[in-house]
Amino acid sequence: MAPSRANTPSDDELDNILNGITEGRDISGTQAESTRPAYASKGSGNAGDGLGIDEEIIITKKRIPIPKLDDNRLLSDPGIPRLRRISKDRLRFKGKGHEYGDIARMLNMYQLWLDDLYPRAKFADALTIIEKVGHTKRMQMMRKEWIDEGKPRRTSAYEEEDADEVVVQAPTTEQATESMEGVEQGEEGAERAGPDEDELDALLAESAQQNTSAPKTLPVRTAGGEDDPFADEMEAMVDMEDMW
């Protein structure tokens, strides 16, 4: 019985064991570490990465591309095409005596257009950039096309003039043909309106009968010497004819 009593712990030892104290040392921490699962110790290094608590967050800003005043922007709809539209609709020059006002309105229109197209640059700087871009091959080709569009079309003008001449000449030819037809119709009408051959023969016969029935009268010289003044000349001409 004695050995069993010696192995049995006392009440104080039981209290120490329950409180995690063995032989004056705290064993609660060592037991907790020994009982901790192995996977917890292995994944302790990546736990902060998954939760994002202990690791520093690095924020990277995305760079917004800066718009450039290049040929693509100038040839887009807000570019030179819009400038051409507003210049036709809004810009009106007053002419002689108003040169200063006309230039001021034109510069104001250019300034407003460039401010909408490329607000990052000042007016003078934007003009310098546009001048450099204008030397590119693409801009030179487009400028040539715009100049050709503004020129009057000579071929169309000549075609219109030719059409007018044809229209003017057409009535004259028609009138000439109508006049010729009228002359021919008039001649035909005159021929138709003329007397027939039988009627002409009858008229000629009547005139011949009248001539035969009429008495022949010869010119009689008056005794008073009233001769024809041309009688002597006529006789001389007759004598000359006989000589030949």
UniProtKB/Swiss-Prot annotation:
GO terms for biological process: DNA repair; DNA replication checkpoint signaling; meiotic cell cycle; replication fork arrest; replication fork processing. It is found in: Nucleus. Transmembrane segments: none annotated. It holds the Pfam family Swi3. Residues 1-47, 172-229 are annotated as: Disordered. It comes from the Eukaryota. GO terms for cellular component: replication fork protection complex. Forms a fork protection complex (FPC) with TOF1 and which is required for chromosome segregation during meiosis and DNA damage repair. FPC coordinates leading and lagging strand synthesis and moves with the replication fork. FPC stabilizes replication forks in a configuration that is recognized by replication checkpoint sensors. Belongs to the CSM3 family. This is Chromosome segregation in meiosis protein 3. GO terms for molecular function: DNA binding. Keywords: Cell cycle, DNA damage, DNA repair, DNA replication inhibitor, Meiosis, Nucleus. Component of the fork protection complex (FPC) consisting of TOF1 and CSM3.
